[in-house]
Amino acid sequence: MLSTLSHTRGPNRPLLELTIGGLLDRTASLYPDRLAVASCHQSKRMTWAELTAAADSVARGLWSLGIRHGDRVGLWSTNCLEWIMMHMGCARAGAALVNVNPAYRSHELGYTLTRSRMKALFLWHKDKRANYEEILERARHGLSLELKHTIYFDSPEWPALLDAPGQLPAHVAVDDVANIQYTSGTTGHPKGVMLTHHNVVNNGQFLAQGFHYTEQDLIVVPVPLFHCYGCVIGTMSALNSGAAIVLPNWTFDAHATLQAVHDERATSVYGVPAMYVAEFGLPDFASFDLTSLRTGMMSGAPCPVEDWLRTHSLLLGERWKEAAHILYFGVREVARF
């Protein structure tokens, strides 16, 4: 009876016993000069060798702040190159990165600051959506926090941290917590889900395997990096394969997403159903050259069959029979091994 209910398909690849930092070293040694990240809206690019060096600089900078193995470090930002640097740098330092939703208001931020016990928070002063500095001041008022450092990316503190002397931890274990993500809180208070290095590395391995990613691929990631879709599916599949991460904009923009596919000759694109609908609704949709695409992912919300088939035909054209646009289901709480 059990055999009829439980089964697996596909190759039985062994789980990787690597930390995020160890995987970064492996990928950088294989493809040092290949593109790792392209942040289109910032006009910034990094190779895998450059990203590895940047991660080490972040880790040493965290050490100089007094951040040690197992400490929590918050990141409150929309999509940017600095987000990827912090993701890799915290992992290298053995610190747990706490993803903070950029849409948080002061009471939500205060809850996260308190519950996570983060010792440092990295953020921008403000953007078109919000003044984060003001929200932070309101959030911390009257609270007893462990927060000792606030580092603004758009201040001299950030480059100074990257140049700070420090050291890397002697050992980071695969079962150490790499990432804490807070749930949406629709049925109660948000819960901090703790994801280990072992979890996210192997999630990335099987995603890269399923998409047949190689160092030749470029993955457009318009979904938010603070979410599991962005920081696990978006970054770790690239880290496992040597593919490049392409960030089209700070937040989702349909035109910027298609422009990134067009300009970078991307081979894969991610999104939730509503993002694809917005892209197809652009008046100039037909002006974008999407012929480089061979695969992609739709996740994050229910998807009617009609929308999925439309995505296949419009993004992949006549190639849809040979290509794969994957529907992916999952929740943060069970996104772990």
What are these model-predicted stretches?
Residues L16, A36-M88, R105-G110, H171, ...:
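Conserved AMP-binding/adenylate-forming core of the ANL superfamily
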Residues E17-L18, P32-L35, A164-Y182, H189, ...:
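Conserved pre-ATP/AMP-binding loop-to-beta segment of ANL
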Residues S77-T78, V98-T114, H125-I135, A243-E264:
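ATP-dependent adenylate-forming carboxylate-activation enzymes
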Residues A243, D263-G271, F280-F337:
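Gly/Ser/Thr-rich phosphate-binding loop
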